[in-house]
């Protein structure tokens, strides 16, 4: 079954960590923190490429686009994984459609998420200071296994 990944960040609050949970109604895995929701959902419909989808609400002016030159994702002590990213205002998508290297990056990333404890995503921006988000991966694998 093909997967599509939608990561939605409503803000960068790391004060209150939640747990990843399986949502049967839409065959997805979700983490809800105080002001942050992250979802890994089944794309269905023949969708080939998984996508990380980030929405940066509070740190950026909603009327100005983010100029980025990519992202770096680090899980635990593994080397940083670099990838392209497409940005439309406050929304960042990864991998970029039809960029094979990004699809390969995702295939490397998912097993690390299943075995890791903490994922750090660094948005490399041209206009703002780089943005770092930390996402706990405790019980991610257990929840993800229910999607298969």
Where are the model-predicted features located?
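Sec-dependent N-terminal signal peptides
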Residues: 3-17
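A generic "folded-domain core" signal
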Residues: 17-148
